[in-house]
């Protein structure tokens, strides 16, 4: 099965509203056709409304970096999935290692977020990944299988087929280190095998799996050439318009 590539930038807690507008203006009319690749920017919640207005009429898509699992209520500081959907947000990143580590998010909470995102007809980008200790102990496959199984609990085959799963080795995020393309392909293969075990081969062949971890314009093509890697979730290299556009050169 041919899966359309997806390149998603994750700005994390960076940029002002003016800088976000400047980036969008530089990028939105210079990306490849979405017949070839889905191009997504994950923005801080503050800028999402402006981002959606800025990309209107173009093929650049917008992701939120997080949401809560309840639509509305007394949840100070949280972001409503219903409100994101009303803005027209396309994707929501959930389960990022920084959310799991710094904010102690659990697989059970991430699972509730996935259900909420699908309820509002957005697409989750579900992150999974292991620590250096787990990797060096040879327990990566076991760890990833446990995360994926818990995070997908109760989702339908149709939902899982349409979502994006991002493998991000924690030891490679923002460190300048990266899992080489063969390791990334192997672990993305573990993700796919776990989905197959849970949902069957057809779903496993449909779900798109990204690699995230110090992806740069210089190495993105090497990852994208691998059988189980369908895209990249990119942090630092997505912050500047020129480097973000260079990430998309692999489709040429």
From Swiss-Prot:
GO molecular function: triose-phosphate isomerase activity
Pfam families associated with the record: TIM
Annotated EC: 5.3.1.1
Annotated compartments: Cytoplasm
Substrates-to-products reaction catalysed: D-glyceraldehyde 3-phosphate = dihydroxyacetone phosphate
Binding site for substrate: 10-12, 174, 214, 235-236
Pathway the protein takes part in: Carbohydrate biosynthesis; gluconeogenesis; Carbohydrate degradation; glycolysis; D-glyceraldehyde 3-phosphate from glycerone phosphate: step 1/1
Function: Involved in the gluconeogenesis. Catalyzes stereospecifically the conversion of dihydroxyacetone phosphate (DHAP) to D-glyceraldehyde-3-phosphate (G3P).
Protein name from the UniProt record: Triosephosphate isomerase
